[in-house]
From Swiss-Prot:
It comes from Pseudomonas aeruginosa (strain ATCC 15692 / DSM 22644 / CIP 104116 / JCM 14847 / LMG 12228 / 1C / PRS 101 / PAO1). This is HTH-type transcriptional activator AmpR. Changing residue 43 to A: Does not affect the activation of ampC transcription. Able to bind the ampC promoter in the presence and absence of beta-lactams. The gene is ampR. GO terms for molecular function: DNA-binding transcription factor activity; sequence-specific DNA binding. Transcription regulator that plays a critical role in the expression of beta-lactamase AmpC, acting by positive regulation of the ampC gene. Has a wider role in the regulation of expression of genes involved in proteolysis, quorum sensing, and virulence. Acts by binding directly to the promoter region of the ampC gene. Probably does not regulate transcription of its own gene. The lineage of its organism: Bacteria, Pseudomonadati, Pseudomonadota, Gammaproteobacteria, Pseudomonadales.
């Protein structure tokens, strides 16, 4: 298709003037004179056969036609600028946007990211965290890493690994725990899922509905583990996500009993294809997950 000549300088002059509602400020941004900007806008109006601005004593006001044109130009220039940025340093750079549960991001993904960057230096990874409730389409994500059973409407889900829950606490509290029954004398920290402690009690040989003295509910495992580290109570959390704290012994695992309530999954929209950057990340993540699964 042969495109008509596009008056790019005039379009840039209009877009800058419309954002600032001022020829003078647009001229400063574009490093040209105010007269040059005014001339370019006038030439665009003549080409289109419509007025794009109302010239007022104290500035400019967009006409209906100008208001229609502005968002299209802003989006187009932003997309061009974003594409040019991907060639920084003489190489095309792919952008990959991944959303992940905060606990997974901090406890498992970040310690391994250096390896991904070394293998794929021209992929710009953008990470966002969520609390497992995520809208992939609305948030513009390529992938979302979630915890659960793997069934999310409209998504393809690839299993990474299970992350069983176990008891974690500070060393001072661990010294007081000689049997699972001793937990009933402590504040129990948990997520919004009320069934986790009953499931663990049952696995440890206690009544599933053992009487609890005190409990605190957290919306993230990161906050819950920090509370446990500070001696606020005893947490039930995935040990795999807190390997560094266990290695440094700032957190202890007093009992071997663990209970599985789900797995981590790599999910994407079924309605969209996978880019080369997505395929690279998926392959790397599945490789790392396989190593994690073998190590359990």
């Amino acid at each position: 298709m042969v495109r008509p000549h596009l008056p790019l300088n005039a379009l840039r002059a209009f877009e800058a003037s419309a954002r600032h509602l001022s020829f003078t400020r647009a001229a400063i941004e574009l490093c040209v004179t105010q007269a040059a900007v005014s001339h370019q806008v006038k030439s665009l109006e003549e080409r289109l056969g419509v007025a794009l601005f109302k010239r007022l004593p104290r500035g400019l006001m967009l006409t209906h036609e100008g208001e229609s044109l502005l968002p299209v130009l802003c989006d187009s220039f932003d997309r061009i600028a974003g594409l040019l940025e991907r060639f920084e340093g003489g190489h095309y750079r792919d952008v990959l946007t991944v959303g992940a549960v905060g606990t997974f991001t901090v406890g498992w993904l970040l310690p391994r990211l250096e390896d991904f960057q070394a293998r794929h230096p021209f992929i710009d990874l953008r990470l966002s965290t969520h609390n497992n409730r995520v809208d992939i389409a609305a948030e513009g994500l390529d992938y979302a890493i979630r915890f659960g059973g793997g069934a999310w409407h409209g998504t393809e889900a690839l299993a990474l690994f299970e992350a069983p829950l176990t008891v974690l606490c500070c060393p001072e509290v661990a010294a007081q725990l000689h049997s699972p029954a001793d937990l009933l004398q402590h504040t129990l920290l948990r997520s919004y899922r009320a069934d986790e402690w009953p499931l663990w009690f049952q696995a440890a040989g206690l009544p599933a509905h053992a009487p609890l003295t005190r409990s605190i509910v957290f919306d993230t495992s990161l906050a819950m583990l920090e509370a446990a580290r500070q001696g606020v109570g005893v947490a039930l959390a995935p040990a795999a996500m807190f390997a560094r704290q266990l290695a440094s012994e700032s957190i202890r695992r007093p009992f071997a009993t663990e209970v599985s309530t789900g797995s981590y999954w790599l999910t994407r929209l079924q309605s969209r294809g996978e880019t080369s950057a997505m395929l690279a990340f998926r392959g790397w993540l599945l490789e790392m997950a396989a190593v994690e699964a073998r190590g359990r």
